[in-house]
Design a protein with these regions (language model features):
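Short metal-coordination and nucleic-acid-contact micro-motifs, chiefly zinc-binding Cys/His arrays
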Residues: 36, 46, 60
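Short hydrophobic beta-strand segments
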Residues: 63-70, 114-119
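Short Cys/His-rich Zn2+-coordinating modules
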Residues: 16-33
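S-adenosyl-L-methionine/SAH cofactor-binding core of RNA-modifying enzymes
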Residues: 88-185, 189
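C-terminal folded domains that constitute the principal catalytic or ligand-binding module
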Residues: 173-174, 181-288
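Short cysteine/histidine-rich zinc-coordinating motifs and their immediately flanking basic loops
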Residues: 51-66
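Histidine-anchored nucleotide/phosphate-binding helix
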Residues: 74-86
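Short cysteine-rich clusters marking metal-coordination/redox-active sites
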Residues: 40-43
């Protein structure tokens, strides 16, 4: 057998959480729908439709913290994975009803971050709801390094990112409940360690473009769409647009694999992602 020379993405927070969850499983996880057979460890797609060479990473000041329902990291259609591909400062934790990961609690208390729990405001007490980001200065806060296993301060970033967060300002940390809607509501109600966080309620006139799972409402967004809206609110325009384009490319590869069709590397989704790529980033090949 010829060696596998395809470029594989390095493991990120969601990938590591998936590996840990698989290690605890007593039997293999069988995904419903989607392509069957061998999957690439870097993108969860079948090897013929691998996405790893197209993975874009955009330096940001904002961070994302995913709190994931039990089997969510195992689902090939999960889009939290895409967020971790694009935003280096993405952390991921499994949710349990009875306890919270100490590293998660340390991250939420870290003075470099201003955390926001992203959730629809209609289900939250009005005094907790915000619709814009809070201007916070960390100069008056106690100083501390990043917690063990947490997110380190971001280095340089592409000037097109547009994040308006200076060295003295707290960096926004968007806490997303990555789950089905019924699960997310349960997680919101039964996570008292999140009760002190401001709740960021997003307002968007857009309709979800996510096509890999069904939803009864067009205004229910998948996790990566929510993250893109958050990044846009933080002024991280390049990261927001890149994540949107990357979701479209992932959807194209996923559905083409499901229907046993070749990838069209020259379609509008791939060309948009190509146009947004950072200097020196991966070049999209129409010959995939």
């Amino acid at each position: 057998m010829a060696p596998d020379t395809r470029p594989h993405a390095l493991p990120h927070a969601v990938s590591r959480l998936r590996a840990a969850r698989l290690a605890r499983s007593s039997k293999p996880f069988l995904a419903r729908g989607g392509p069957h057979g061998e999957r690439c460890a870097g993108c969860r797609l079948v090897p013929s439709h691998c996405l790893c060479s197209l993975r874009p990473m955009v330096p940001t000041q904002a961070g994302v913290c995913l709190i994931m329902a039990d089997i969510e990291p195992l689902k090939p259609s999960n889009t939290g994975w895409l967020i971790a591909d694009v935003v280096a400062d993405t952390a991921a934790f499994g949710w349990t009803r009875t306890s919270a990961d100490p590293t998660l609690l340390a991250m939420l208390a870290d003075p470099q971050w201003q955390p926001y729990l992203v959730f629809p405001g209609e289900f939250v007490a009005p005094e907790r709801v915000v619709t814009t980001l809070i201007a916070c200065n960390r100069a008056t806060q106690p100083t501390a390094g990043p917690p063990q296993g947490g997110l380190a301060p971001s280095g340089g970033r592409d000037p097109r990112s547009g994040g308006a967060w200076g060295q003295s300002a707290k960096r926004p940390l968007f806490v997303l409940l990555d789950a089905t809607w019924p699960e997310a509501r349960k997680m919101f109600r039964k996570s008292p360690y999140l009760n002190h966080l401001p709740v960021l309620s997003l307002e968007s006139e857009h309709i979800s473009r996510y096509r890999l799972r069904r939803s009864r409402r067009d205004d229910h967004f998948c996790t990566s769409e929510v993250a893109a809206l958050c990044l846009d609110l933080a002024g991280e325009t390049l990261a927001s647009q890149t994540l949107e384009a990357y979701l479209d490319v992932f959807t194209h590869h996923y559905l083409r694999a499901k229907n046993q069709l070749l990838v069209d590397g020259g379609d509008a989704a791939h060309m948009r992602l190509q146009a947004l790529r950072l200097p020196g980033g991966a070049t999209i090949s129409p010959s995939l």
